[in-house]
Amino acid sequence: MCIGPLKKICHWGPLTALGIIKIITLITIHCSRQWWPPQESFWATANFCFFFFFSGSTLFHFISAIFEGPGFLPLKWKPEKATDAQFLQYCTVCQGYKAPRSHHCRKCGLCVMKMDHHCPWINNCVGHHNHGHFTAFLASAVGGCFISTVILIAWVVTVLSLKPIPFPPPSVFTLILVIFTIGLSIGVVLTVGMLLYFQMISIIKNKTEIEDWISEKAYHRRFGTDEKFIHPYSKGWLFNMRQVFTWDCSPVGDGINWPVIDGCDQYTLTKEQLAQKMDKRRRARRYRIIKPSSGSWLPIQHGWGVLCHPPYTDETRIKLDVTDIVIVTRWRRYWLFGEKEQKAIIDFPIKRVRGWFPRPCAIELIESNQYTLTSSKSD
């Protein structure tokens, strides 16, 4: 069953989301028909249809976001002008250049057009092609669950009141199931509503989650100077929203060439990324592994400090052996982030080994900053 197109569905994220959608929809329809039967009046029918619309819209846009996908760059992609390659980062995994706004997703294994983030609930990235569907899914889920919460709470109040009810008394199991569903609905309204809020801010600014991080680093790079970094893709909130919201949620543009504001060009952001990469290389330090790292997320053998202070990220924890050399670019009190130094093999792409490992496993070797990190996706 989990082959071909269905492979994207067979994952804990989509299956959990589909289960929540199904439970909320079925229980709400059941309670709505008892509390306010649609045949009773025009407004009762409108209430029933309104919820049904949101439920159907949630399911449609959810499935569309999964199967439409974010849009991936072709393998070994190159810009039309060979001279433009100097402004782009090279992806060793895809063996091609990354177009403006594109980033490599280690979970999808490809470079994603206008990558925002990898969402476990759709088991896919949110990017250029499915950004509209994903946002519509969030909005529909929040709207539908808000209506569901009102209907279910009204049903419970009616059942628990001392007045006669116009439908058969529910069993204890049914009452518990409805209260559980209320919790699910409220949880969706709060959590998905917060995600929808951040997505709308991102769309209004025309700045993805990754680009927001790049802009923040660009600000700190220029701190104390008169130079300012201007995000090149924000051309006003209305224009920005039209780039994502269309009648059929289809993407605008080819995902490679983007409208930019006056004074910027297609490579304004990529040039900034390259400059940040150079700064990162200058800060890099070499560490030698003195204790093996198992790659475990719960490395209790390295002490309670390491165990209780993990990096709050889903980035890889890497396995390392004694005498391995790691180029470290990020530091925490109990953890280090770096890339394992490997020997290059001619005509054979190296699979990069980089991620977090416990700080007690390594000691710094030298203070030199002359290191060359394999060029790939932005951190």
Predicted features and spans:
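Membrane-associated feature with strongest affinity for ZDHHC
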Residues: 1-104, 109-118, 122-379
